C-alpha cells in the first residue's frame, strides 16, 4: 500500500535500494511498472530470492508522489 511510504522510514532510488537490499535493511520494495526493466528487473529478482515483498506501482510519477518528491521514482523501499 503506497500510503506506507509517507508514514515509515524509506529510501528512494535504484542505487540506495540496491545497497539496502544487500545489507538486509529492506522490509518491502515498490517498483514502478513504467521504469526501465533493465533497472528494476535485477531488484525484483533479488527480492524474490531473499523473500522481500514487492509491490508494483503503475507509474514512476505516482511512486515519486507517494515518496514525497517532485520527480518520478523507479524504485523505493520501506526500511526495517
List each language-model region with its residue ranges.
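C-terminal structural segments of small proteins and small subunits
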Residues: 7, 50-80
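Ribosome large-subunit tunnel/peptidyl-transferase-proximal elements
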Residues: 1-25, 36
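Short secondary-structure boundary/capping segments within folded domains
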Residues: 19-22, 45, 67-68
